[in-house]
Amino acid sequence: FMTSEDLWFRPVDIKMGPDGALYILDFYNKVIGHYEVPLTHPGRDRNRGRIWRVFYTGKDGKQSPPPLPNFTAMSVEELIKNLGSKNQTMRIMAGNELVAREDGDATKSLLAAINKPADNFQQVHAMWALLRLNALPDQAIETIITNPAPFVRVHGIKMATSKPQLNEGLATLVQKALEDTDGRVQIAAVQGLAQHPSEANLKAILSFRTKVNQNDSHLYYASRLALREQVRNPEAWKGLPSQSSDPLALKALADVALGLPGASSAGFLANKLALIQPEGDREIAAVRMITRDGTDADKTYIVSYMKNAQRPKARQAE
């Protein structure tokens, strides 16, 4: 896309500007491999850098550069219109300006825009602006969580779960989103519920964790992390985990228990070890955790468990 005969040319970042031009950050330095050159080397340049502005000049090369928009001079109506721009930077900067003004008229216009949006972009960015102004109704979030467009549903879930408290209605919708047909929506729901530990969310995440496709490494890891966050509080182990008897659910809980040292998680492992039946290194890790963090009763049990006559002598020795 872009080359230079200048041997100091070091492009390190690229952004699209609100004017539609591309801005390329040029570190501009003689040194290429910084791990090879001492910090005190005189060839290191500490004073210069360049920003390249790249824009279309037309087939004849005579087209003028695009003008830079002045958001501070725009009316509320112009800013709201730009929330629907095809240029993401334009949308973001227009939203930032609306929030920075803290204008009551802007809030009213934003509320009107989300009720009759020109397009999905305008609706989403108007809602984020209202959320930042603490003026976004929960009903509006509920509406877009079920929007036909997956990217809109993702934003709705992120808005809902960014709140300090997730009310029951929104929580139910986010839980249902775990069954969405779009992977981006699912991972947004998983990551969002991770921020709101509760018995209902734990149940939803645990059920999802046992069904998620392990070949989807991102979603699989996100569900694992979310499950851990649901039981990070030691009190959480006294609820659903202690009552569960489903082998798949217990294995999923045991997986995260090993990453949460403490008496509660160790007690869970001791009580459910016979049902979980961990193998190899997982079993050794569970035994070590129980003997380290468990109660005296847990430790007594684990000794009898390991001495079971049906167990190989080599495994008992380990």
Model-derived segments and spans:
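Short beta-alpha connecting loops at secondary-structure transitions
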Residues: 7, 32-40, 64, 176, ...
